[in-house]
Amino acid sequence: MAEGQAIQIINTHGQQVVDTWCFNAADMTEFMSMAHLHATLESIFPAEGDALVTNHRRPILTLERDTSPGRHDTVIAACDRHRYALLGCDNDHDNCTDNLASALAEVGLEAPVCPSPLNLWMNIPIGPDGGVIWGAPLCKPGDYVTLRAAMDCVVVLSACPQDMIPINGAACTPTEVHYSLLG
């Protein structure tokens, strides 16, 4: 995406978590960082108008619009083959970490690491004891977010394929999402 361009990500059927990454197009070692975001926002929940920052503490995206209840996770790492092995799955279970690598490889890019993603619509409240609660998404079909680029960047999305726990709703069935690039 070019600086100033926006992407609208639509939760077509509702309930679908979308792992979202963003990298500086000129330097893939600079990427959207949830740990740096926490310090910048002094919150773990980004809201409309918030700048999403990189590991260099520079704005890379702005959460411009959010028609959902606004619950997005910034704490949980992307699912990977190791997570699924712990859940008793085969080593070849689809996962967001491999989806990131595959999507970047398709355009001739490679991430130096798999950063913790912005998990759109993933409902992970923090309990009174500090533990995480694995809640179902609060969004409904057609909810969307609009993210505007603060620099030239590469955005990667993965409709989370989690089908072992109800993070994508009670049916445990991942569904597609849609996106549009806006001027």
Predicted ranges, named:
Residues 1-183:
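Acidic, Ser/Thr/Pro
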